[in-house]
């Protein structure tokens, strides 16, 4: 059978749409979507036929029912939400690709109230005059960090760019070579520096930088000293770096401001909970740093934001920088950030109700109980499915605490028919996508990042996998 004859058997777009009307698809899906997806499907079939060889053409038949099913599936897929909730079984708490920090259930009411109604975003209720959107978080940030003032923009890279562009445009910023980090997505400190208009002045070497390296680079062109916390990697062995207090003292001596990007934004001493020390914002402010920048959606456990705290005279200048408006946060981010920060007013409340902190500090016994509960629900699902509880380690993720290994419990899955890769793919393509990891031909689900409310979806997904 030649290609022309097979192509002539392809139903027209109008024919297919008429048949779909009988299935009442158009009552559920807008007609414009049905028409577009039908055209795409017909075009896909046409291209496939044109690329077939003689052997494939000989036995090929067009299945109208299959075409209908494909169009229906395409329409439903097009109308469904792309950005949706998933289950994180990877054990990476701050999984960048899965949205980093989870917001607390305690604050969703506040976010919805602001999102669904008019709000006090930029109005002073007392005077009735225009106010500043930043005022909603300034006082709580000052209270929590001890800083003189605060400002919030849409992410930490923007915060660093704003700081450098305000303080050092056209002048030099001194930074250690060992701190010229890449912060993800190929964005690097030197690139941010260049975009800000500041001039990078590297000192020291990758593994060793001394105070005299900084001092020797100071000139009339020096606008600031920059300290970058290398939160996403560690240099081990023959190393030396300059302490924050020493850099601040050097800056004070030469009347040069010190800027620190601490990245992760820790507001609680995590050592109290058995974790490695991670520099807190309060420590930086207490050390006398003029400006500190950090993320809202890493260890802070809030929404994506770039938070700037420090000396009032510098932050006042940043508020007047035209770039500030271009990178400002919206009302949803502000509502989520304010509500998250208010949880920090009591440390126990923060640990209990901010998911990132709760997962970081959760003890192994609690995780083991959750693993046992899920194990009992899964073990009898399918004779081909072998379920075990094993020990493993979770990761912090999000470019934070790279050396920290958190003991955890994982559910491992093996199937007598399906490979681990096939199971992983099926779970990932479930209606509530489940992300796992594979090791030694086993699918692993880490209970540190799986919540009890996820269990019902995991059970349903594995029932589907077993079919």
Swiss-Prot record:
EC code: 2.9.1.1
Modified residues (N6-(pyridoxal phosphate)lysine): 298
Keywords on record: Cytoplasm, Protein biosynthesis, Pyridoxal phosphate, Selenium, Transferase
Entry's localization field: Cytoplasm
GO BP, sorted A to Z: conversion of seryl-tRNAsec to selenocys-tRNAsec; selenocysteine incorporation
Function description: Converts seryl-tRNA(Sec) to selenocysteinyl-tRNA(Sec) required for selenoprotein biosynthesis.
UniProt-recorded name of the protein: L-seryl-tRNA(Sec) selenium transferase
């Amino acid at each position: 059978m030649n290609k022309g004859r097979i192509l002539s058997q392809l139903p027209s777009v109008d024919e297919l749409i008429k048949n779909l009307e009988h299935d009442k698809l158009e009552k559920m899906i807008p007609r414009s979507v049905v028409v577009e997806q039908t055209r795409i499907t017909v075009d896909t079939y046409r291209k496939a036929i044109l690329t077939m060889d003689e052997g494939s053409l000989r036995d090929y038949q067009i299945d109208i029912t299959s075409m209908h099913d494909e169009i229906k599936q395409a329409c439903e897929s097009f109308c469904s939400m792309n950005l949706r909730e998933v289950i994180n079984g990877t054990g990476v708490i701050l999984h960048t690709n899965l949205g980093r920090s989870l917001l607390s259930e305690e604050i969703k009411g506040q976010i919805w109230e602001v999102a669904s109604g008019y709000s006090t975003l930029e109005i002073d209720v007392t005077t009735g005059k225009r106010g500043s959107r930043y005022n909603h978080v300034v006082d709580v940030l000052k209270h929590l960090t001890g800083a003189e003032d605060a400002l919030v923009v849409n992410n930490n890279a923007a915060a660093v760019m704003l700081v450098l562009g305000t303080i050092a445009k056209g002048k030099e910023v001194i930074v250690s070579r060992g701190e010229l980090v890449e912060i993800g997505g190929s964005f690097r400190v030197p690139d941010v520096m260049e975009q800000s208009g500041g001039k990078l002045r590297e000192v020291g070497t990758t593994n060793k930088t001394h105070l005299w390296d900084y001092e020797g680079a100071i000139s009339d062109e020096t606008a600031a000293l920059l300290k970058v916390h290398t939160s996403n990697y560690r240099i081990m062995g023959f190393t030396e770096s300059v302490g924050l207090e020493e850099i601040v003292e050097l800056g004070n001596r030469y009347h040069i401001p010190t800027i620190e990007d601490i990245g992760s934004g820790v507001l609680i001493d995590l050592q109290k909970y058995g974790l490695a020390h991670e520099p807190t914002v309060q420590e930086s402010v207490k050390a006398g740093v003029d400006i500190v920048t950090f993320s809202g959606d890493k260890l802070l456990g809030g929404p994506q934001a770039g938070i700037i705290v420090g000396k009032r005279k510098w932050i006042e200048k940043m508020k007047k920088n035209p770039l500030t408006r271009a990178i400002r946060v919206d009302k949803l981010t502000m509502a989520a950030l304010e509500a998250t920060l208010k949880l920090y007013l009591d440390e126990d409340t923060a640990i209990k109700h901010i998911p990132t902190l709760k997962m970081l500090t959760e003890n192994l016994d609690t995780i083991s109980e959750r693993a046992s509960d899920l194990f009992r629900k899964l073990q009898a699902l399918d004779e081909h499915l072998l379920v075990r509880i094993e020990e493993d380690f979770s990761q912090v993720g999000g470019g934070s605490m790279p050396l920290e290994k958190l003991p955890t419990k994982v559910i491992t899955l093996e199937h007598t028919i399906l490979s681990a890769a096939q199971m992983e793919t099926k779970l990932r393509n479930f209606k509530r996508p489940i992300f796992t990891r594979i090791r030694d031909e086993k699918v692993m689900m880490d209970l540190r990042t799986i919540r009890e409310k996820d269990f019902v979806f995991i059970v349903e997904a594995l029932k589907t996998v077993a079919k």
